[in-house]
């Protein structure tokens, strides 16, 4: 913005006798012969001005002409003419004159006075201007203040609502710099002068700040404001013209209940079966996918019999005698320990140990034209794991790509060659359970080992107490008591033989959990020197390691074998497992078996 000296007599005459304001407001006086009209230079240096208010504001004939170049101390020397669009800071510098009386040259009007000052008729579309010069006959720069009312509204409906920014845009506020920015109005005790001026000012008769300005015609809504997202460019264009490439429609649940009907897709998926029927691992399933076990020698059946048979013999011979002659608490407590032992055995044997889904990270197919001797993509990598013992320390642990399952194994995950599955946090494959011991069934395995040890010791002690009490009551020798109760004596021998093995496993795994390691990690660490052995997953001490393993909740299964099969599930095969060839490992991975036709599935 520039202030220029006018040499035109007409201009001086107009300056001395300014035209009256439309609202009757007094105009500021001229200072030192400088034109009271603040002219704004156009962005391109041309005299491009719009005459949008020529029909409402009297036309002024006073035009400031360019004088000689001003001196260095001149006011106009602070402004420069440029061809590029000015920034917000440059636009503010055109309207702010700190060297002169600001109240005499610049009085920003409030939104109410500015709307009344315009007085232009309503239009069907939002009026927007392209010139950024702050000219007096130009629209306001606020997008909300432009007229957006349709022609069908009456004059009463066109009444402009009051602005919410009156406190900061009112022209009679002299202490603009000292305004209170606190969200509460009681932070100061001294009342600002601007508050008194706002309270005592004379409000225009046609404005009422307490009235909610709404159009009487509710059928016709005003056009969208330029700030609305619905008024963006090409918003009214047909939807077919949109580029929908790489877009996917998200599914959402119904907001209201509908009639329960079986959809064709759901019925079709149910006809295809469940997920376990398409699983390609070396696993057998029972109970509709609820129970699973490795397709190997069923040693777990023998393990269950080793628990069931002695328990049955105890309740058949020693239990009734102990109930009536010593205490009923002995057989009851023995039954409770047996329940814990056998239930933990069932859970550890038939529960999903943590099978990782297959085909999640498939390698790209090999190009036939590529050199067959070329090195393929890497199958080993390192993953940084944050240590629980420090806030800043971390350690790299190796991870490997499983070519059988086509996945990058997470840390502590290994592929079991018996189950032919990648198991999360695999400890070992237990032949007594005929199942892998992983993250989801490790607690059941540890509970089975612990309770089987207690059960064997309980069996030994209760059977021996039966023989000794009977010998003392009858007054016979120990050999005669054994001859009378041979089965309890056999249970004493069985308990003495069965207790050491689960007891050693219990102590060994208690030691491993206290170190924060699995069986595989502990055995693999002995391949390195003692100085190179690290435990990145330890919690710092034995108690925390025990809590982290035995106190953590069991994670959900990844495979969901009981669910219905969905066509296109990459985790599963496209053909049911009963139609796939079996026993390819004894044939050196050469499939010499009959392959059924594709339509047989």
Swiss-Prot record:
It is found in: Endoplasmic reticulum membrane. Residues 1-95, 112-268, 582-601 are annotated as: Disordered. Autopalmitoylated. The chain crosses the membrane at residues 301-321, 326-346, 445-465, 487-507. PROSITE patterns: DHHC. It is an enzyme of class 2 (transferase). Residues 1-300, 347-444, 508-601 are cytoplasmic. It comes from the Eukaryota. PANTHER family: PALMITOYLTRANSFERASE APP, ZINC FINGER DHHC DOMAIN CONTAINING PROTEIN. This is Palmitoyltransferase erf2.
